[in-house]
Amino acid sequence: MRFTRSILHQYAQETVRQRERTEPDLHAAYLVGSLLDPEPLLGGTTDIDVILVHKYQAPVERETLAITPEVSLDLFHRTRNDYEQHRQFRRDPWMGYPLTFNHILLFDTDHWLEFIQASVSAEFHRVDNVLARVNTLSSTARASWFTLIQNTTLPHQEWLRNYLEILSLAAIAIAGLIGAPLTTRRFLVTVKVSCE
């Protein structure tokens, strides 16, 4: 079977419909990750990332289900309380960006998620919010760098792994000046274009 963005979106919608029937406290669901890209497949593989928001309690933090060897379904469970300070998501590079996209809603009780989306999207690209998102990432990279150069006892492989993670965070911060943070799967494909 040849997967298209539309077919992957249908899988996500069907999963949420099934969860509506089996999880009565499901409050909202939306897409994140590679399905927000025009080309979600990378090398013929992808994952369908869905955030399920529960009214009171999330049954687990995360579930991963294989649809085929090439496609997996990642379900992240959150509660409504996680969204109480939703305006702060304007300054959060990981939570904020997905909420600014159109066509991500899979399920929404009483237009709750639409309201959250509108609140996050308003002034999301204002300079102070962009800089706050970038500073979060660059400060972490900088602190990690100073920790790394002071630690002379690390084995070479661990030092190198930490060094590459720091470079990754720095590149993600630079890319954040003009757009969404780079993801692990597409990092090498998109880092050059994003940082130019």
Residue spans of the language-model regions?
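Metal-dependent nucleotidyltransferase catalytic core
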Residues: 1-27, 32-101
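Internal, well-ordered alpha/beta segment that forms a basic, Gly-enriched binding/recognition surface
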Residues: 80-145
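Weak global preference for isoleucine
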Residues: 7, 35, 48-53, 67, ...
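Conserved nucleotidyltransferase catalytic core and NTase-mimicking acidic/glycine-rich helix/loop elements
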Residues: 129-196
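Short, functional N-terminal and low-complexity linear motifs
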Residues: 17-19, 83, 106-112, 157-159, ...
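A sequence-composition feature that detects small, non-aromatic residues
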Residues: 12, 28-29, 58, 66, ...
